[in-house]
Amino acid sequence: RTKALLVVHLYGKCAFTDELLSICEEHQLLMIEDNAQAHGCLWKGRRTGSVGHAAAHSFYPGKNLGALGDAGGVTTDDEELANIVRALGNYGSSKKYVFDYVGQNSRMDEVQAAVLCEKLKWLDRDNERRVAIATKYVDGIQNTAITLPTKDYLANDVFHIFPVLCAKRDLLQRELHQRSIETIIHYPIPPHKQKCYSEWNALALPITERIHREELSLPLNPTMTDEEVEMVISNVSEIKL
């Protein structure tokens, strides 16, 4: 009964594989991309957000391509779908005072669009800096209590965040906070444990749950200086866990 496959490029990592595309082709499934965290990421010469039937993008200020306020978009080469999406974001209306769908007002204002057009010019440069910082972390952090992304992981990634795993994650976060290094957990509660999915709360997904217990995101953004990067590396390396 499956009609579509939702591919999530989480943390800036491209989620495409040849096998995934073959499955969609074999079973005639639509591929929908969640490209909220992977703006500008390349896979075999193509950008994420341009491979599937449609893709959703977040332009929240913290994203690789971020506006000054809340904003988002959908890309597709399906003209009919594009018209439906435009209508849904315009109260469900494609013609003034005529409503084809139950929609909402989610139009992007001109100021956000102008900011994004300007920042788009610098996206590749900023992503290159993100990858450079991630590479420094992978090469420089020496702490056996922490699992880092592998060298292979660096490919096809624009590092919206830099995730590590640590069995003593909360202790690591406290130690770094005391050293004025702020970190974030992405994400503390897995989807199947959320209140809104109460029918799935009893489901056991041990790998998912371990990741949620152990994940910690180290500081990473293209404005970081080399000195700040080295401070993160040295402090993470010397903390005893």
Task: Label every PLM stretch briefly.
Residues R1-A67, G73-T75, S217:
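Active-site phosphate-binding strand-loop segment of PLP-dependent enzymes
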Residues A4-V8, K13, T17-E19, L42, ...:
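PLP-dependent aminotransferase class I/II
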